[in-house]
Amino acid sequence: MTLTTNYLSFTEGENDFAQQYLPELYEQEVERYGNRTIAGFLRMVGAEMPMTSDQVVWSEQNRLHVAYETCEVIDDTTIRVNIDPDFTVGPPVGAVGSKECAIKVNNTLVVYGNGTTGAGIGKSMKVLVTAAPTNYQGGSAGVPRTCDVTVAPYTASGLTTSAGPEAGEFDGSGSSGGLNSAVAVFVYGSEWVKGSNTDALASIEPDFTQYSNSPIIIRDKFEINGSDTAQIGWVEVATEDGTSGYLWYLKSESETRLRFEDYMEMAMVEGELAATNSAVAGIALNNANYTGNKGTQGLFAAIQDRGHEFQNFAGTGGGNAALEDFDTILAQLDFEGAIEENMLFCNRSLALAIDNMLANVNGSAQAGPSNGASYGLFENDASMALNFGFDGFRRGSYDFYKTDWKYLNDASTRGLAKDIEGVLVPAGTSTVYDQMLGTNIRRPFLHVRYRASEADDRRLKSWVTGSVGGAYTSSLDAMEVHFLSERCLVTQAANNFMLFTT
């Protein structure tokens, strides 16, 4: 009689290796998730360099030209300049409260209406500065620092009044709430009369802008007791780093190492500085075991703090709508460093949105060349597999190279939290003098600094303790494998980076 109990089953029923029959065994694990490691992003776009301090500090240039975005027309000849949210900084005399305006007498200005309503919106007027800035106010906490600049328009009209066929551009209600009085100004030159002198003219001192970051210590440990190191399994171990054999602890130790190497990169991408009133800062103050825990600024945090964020790319539809979104990004790049070559690291949804955008522009996606334009040379025919993906493209004066970022797609990392879709990284470098090499080197904007000296290299330390596996450091009947790294990420010129979010 045929019964279920007549069949050998090791996964169901009561059969096990106590039976005399051997099942058909696959000794190797199936790699159902492929290569599970996600590191490699920073190796692709950055570099690693040693450091010998608890902090890395760098300075970045400010803008060259004088411009103020938040100003208002007070009357026909007066513009009130908000000095604090400026693009350039005038002669710094000390504290914020004594910050001076960088506009000088006889400067020529463009006054542009950037309010929300009124006849002056989107229009500009040229004026001459007739007196040095006066009436400095504010500058304390929460109170903007302002001054008044007296000007004379080059047109027959004043800032607020009309003359002849011309009309006054701005209503001049100033702080009384007139929406049409909001303006931005920038200096485009100066005009002086014959025989003039500049004895009373102040010079502009560039403001010093610095940023800093501190390394964090990342640690992990693997432990196996002495008895289990001799435990032979029936599954052959094979991991991403080449470890193989029938000892299961080899797999455990290898995966601990691989996971730690991924953490070394993930911590640089996701790192967050502890806010003054945060729980982490409170623990560090009140618990001796956590003294010094202050976090580190990772890539995402640096871009959110000093860079740009684009929400819901192609959210209104693909094709031309997505192209309009991308043109908005180009306008922002023009506004910043205008670095020609940029890299796009995308999750699946952003990569497909960009592919769809480019395919829509290409005539092959629009029912033939009569409805669109084909760019480049394509050797497709009916017997070939079509390639709908794009690795790179040029728009305006910028080149973009697109690649998938596994970290954003993996279900156990950012694929689980889908609020970040991608990042734009400029292919920019800065020239610095390397004291260790004694030469000038070009350093990428994005790079890792790790603690190292002649006594200790903490880029990636690994050591074994216990009394098993060749280590005889204690009476512990176990092998402990320790991992440690001390590092931080330096994100320079973050104003050229962009984060794509949902």
How should each PLM-predicted stretch be described?
Residues 1-383, 387, 404-409, 425-502:
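Flexible, glycine/threonine- and acidic-rich loop/arm segments that mediate assembly and lattice contacts
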Residues 391-418, 424-430:
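C-terminal regions of proteins
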